Amino acid sequence: MKDSHQTIGVFVRPTHYQNPLFEELERAKEWVLKLLEDEGFESFMIDSLDGAQDERLIEKAYAFLCLGGDGTILGALRMTHSYNKPCFGVRIGNLGFLSAVELNGLKDFLQDLKQDRIKLEEHLALEGRIGKISFYAINEIVIAKKKALGVLDIKAYAGHTPFNTYKGDGLIIATPLGSTAYNLSAHGPIVHALSQSYILTPLCDFSLTQRPLVLGAEFCLNFCAHEDALVVIDGQATYDLKANQPLYIQKSPTTTKLLQKNSRDYFKVLKEKLLWGESPSKKR
């Protein structure tokens, strides 16, 4: 095992003690920490996803183990994005598009990691800016209404060129990795996770002619809403967007890095998670 592989940071899904998953996560956390020790890894816990961590520990880690569902992985990926470190998910929860393994497969995964038999996937991430505030998004950036009533007008530009005005509940700007998340629920297209593109999917648009749009990641985009709006990052963080204030979005210079098993195949994951080709009775 390479020396640089010896330290693993461990994220655990934040869970209230009254949550039904609390005891399961606590048991799993202790088991994972013991397994890492037995396999020769140093490890440290990361207590929250708010970024209030010791930078020296973050920089020391080779990778980050995320114990939970896709939400835990998304939070960890955003927090570690600027450090250019990979994450891998150990699924406990309902969703698992991003997870590398189930809990019972972690030992084999760690042994493969020690032998460099794990592949590194690099995905496009978004970098957004509102005024002096900048942020990263792994799955999507959503411009959403702040008020329950009415229609939100959003003007969209590629560079300095206006190309659309969306009128509805909002707009999703998704990454290919995030195309199977909120974007898919809003009837946006699935785009291969390793593609270099943005997916723009309107939310309940007032015009029946509006359709999702896929753009190459070489474009720098900006958006303005006609009234105060919310900008939602991966469904986990929000920022205020003032009326006519530009939101700038571009491809992040740093990729989202995920460790996966060599045997993982994206199309098999889609078929398994979305039940493609299954009969209606099996889907139920």
Curated annotation (Swiss-Prot):
This is NAD kinase. Pfam families: NAD_kinase, NAD_kinase_C. The lineage of its organism: Bacteria, Pseudomonadati, Campylobacterota, Epsilonproteobacteria, Campylobacterales. InterPro entries: ATP-NAD_kinase_N, ATP-NAD_kinase_PpnK-typ_C, NAD/diacylglycerol_kinase_sf, NADK. NAD(+) binds at D70, G71, N139, E140, K167, D169, L177, T180, A181, Y182, N183, L184, S185, Q236. It catalyses: NAD(+) + ATP = ADP + NADP(+) + H(+). Its main location: cytoplasm. One of its GO terms (biological process) is NADP biosynthetic process. It comes from the Bacteria. Belongs to the NAD kinase family. The gene is nadK. It is an enzyme of class 2 (transferase).
